[in-house]
Amino acid sequence: FMEWSAAFFKTWKPDEVTIAFDPSVRYYLYDAFEGVNYELDVSKEPGHRIKNLKWPNGKAVKDTDTFVVAGNNYRATTQMLTAADIFLPGEDLPKLLEIDVRGDVGGIRELLGEYIRTVKGGTIEPHVNNNWKIVGNNWKAADHQKAVQLLREGKLALNENADARTLPGKAITTAEIAKF
């Protein structure tokens, strides 16, 4: 499942100074994962990108370890519990523990809203725990910063996709920033 989600990124090439996204993958299909620490190596081809997968205590995740994965009904019924993109026909599918879990409050959206109102006092403070990072993008920091500056100044642009459900599929290259 993690490798499937990591295919959202294009494979990084040595002349690139930004990361690009695969325009054939809708951005709402990208999932980040909590409860584990990991690296996503964009220099590797899809299917071989998740590296250094560890539990929060630092112990390596083993092939025999099991996970409890919570997801909304859309992700469960379109990817997690069907033979298609993640699991091939004939492979064992994950065991469904519960479906359409609803309390007195309602579904996942309502449960999250109730949690924010009652436990967090109506406000949540964003917090990044840095349990994952992108690696394999071995650009020179100065080249990357120059690309960021040129993008902010409007001197360079990432391609605009006709479809608002995708992110830019083009990376900025060293040749492009060398023109400035």
List PLM regions with ranges.
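Extracellular/lumenal glycan-associated surfaces
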Residues: 175, 179-180
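Catalytic centers of hydrolytic enzymes
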Residues: 1-173
